[in-house]
Amino acid sequence: MLRRAARVPILTWHASDVAGPDHGSNDHVAFREDLEHLTRLGLRVVPLAAIARSLARGELSSLEGCIGLSFDDGTDFDFHDMPHPQWGPQRSMSNILADFRARHGKDTQPSLHATAFAVVSPEARRKLDEACLIGCRWWHDDWYAAAERRGTIAIECHSWDHNHASLSDSVSRAPRGGFMIDNDADAEAEISEATRVLRTLRKRDGDVLFGYPYGDVSDFLARDWFPRRAESLGIAAAFSADDEEPVHASSSLWAIPRFTARHQWKTPGELERLLREAGALPRPLGRITSLFARRAAIATTVPAAEALPDWRDYFQTWEVNDAKALAGELFRKSFGHDIPDMAHHYVLVYSPPAGSDDVQPRIVAYVHQLPKEGFHLCGGMCVDERAYRTFPKWLFGQVRDAGGLATLVTSDSMQMLGDSPAAFGYVGDSKARAADLRTGFVDTGIDLLMVKWLKPLPEEEKRRLVERAAALMPF
């Protein structure tokens, strides 16, 4: 079995953000242009519910090359075409989706869908309409059921009243203008009641998704309240905002990351760069249906330095079952014995560019991970140093600048660890130590033992985990 370290981006827009006629000032223009550009990039739109489901089941790799779309606040602009007194008629987000389908047909983006996270309280919406919009009554709930029936927008929960700074009162006692809830009473008031009422308004039972107001994720909600209460309330997942990464295998189900329009990109080109830097774009040159099946060469021209292909297009990290058959020889050359039995084995696959003497994909690095109670052990990292000599000069330079093959396979495998607070490495040579340092590992104070902290922990808990990992050396 091969499984790639999938990275699935989720984007969000605010339909009420209408401050001009162009992409950087109007989220309707931005959404229309972004949707076209995402399609040209080869990304496949899937519902947020599908992303949450795949993450919960440990099947995110099935969504490689996919993307999720969402809108925040749930104003009427999401569903109705609205006249803006300064900037004229605004095509609704729902109708922008319909226009896309009419232009391209059902075969392009067959799963076209978006999620609207709505503020549920009618009174809060009325007050926020006056305070935050321009008092034109643009914030109703009478369209929720119609949107659900249309089938391209799901209405989900953005809390009872957003705990908004513009409100004179809120059901939450948390500081206004944020959502850092830290107790059961406030969580029940903002989320439980909103979830119940939302099901009635949208006329659809079943699971609810939650979008954190302001993207504020408190430790109490993500690590305590949602894990305790979500199942009984029928809440399937919770989504943050303004994040710096796409969804990956170790993302928390209660803090699924999203990127936000205008905050993080203002043109389709900026969006493409954001996704490329996050490793979230499809990698057509690295797609292989059978690891050792030859593939047709893909023409690549390199006319100038600024036009160089991205080195990541030629490398993929996979989790494999039969590591001894795939990477056993490489491991034996490095360590003098067979690959040990471990829970998780990862290989880095290199697919040479067109024009190379051999376009056969091959394994150039290996690492394994062993889960323990409360942490992971990372070891066995080895690299086929001969591979560097076969890289084109431009590719060699990019890989070197990125930290090398060891850094890549270690970093990718860390993305696939799952919900773990720490990863420990047993580091026996200077090259492995350098790669671990580039990946975020630090010294523990114990010879040869390094650690990467994946979650904030009290110092006492860190010391306890270090002692437990040290007792397992070597690994």
What do these predicted regions represent?
Residues 15-152, 163, 200, 206, ...:
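Active-site beta->alpha N-cap acidic-glycine motif
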Residues 1-3, 8, 155-167, 368-388:
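Short, solvent-exposed beta-strand-terminating loops
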Residues 52, 201, 206-209, 214-267:
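His/Asp/Glu-enriched short active-site or ligand-binding loop at hydrolase and phosphoryl-transfer sites
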Residues 299-307, 419-475:
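Terminal substrate-recognition subdomain of acyl/acetyltransferases
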Residues 9-11, 69-71, 114-116, 155-158, ...:
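Hydrophobic faces of well-ordered beta-strands that scaffold small-molecule active sites
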Residues 309-313, 318-386:
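A conserved beta-strand-loop-helix scaffold within acyl/acetyltransferase catalytic domains
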Residues 139, 145-150, 161-202:
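Alpha-helical scaffold elements lining the catalytic groove of polysaccharide deacetylases
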Residues 376-440, 444-446:
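Acyl-donor binding region in acyl/amide transferases
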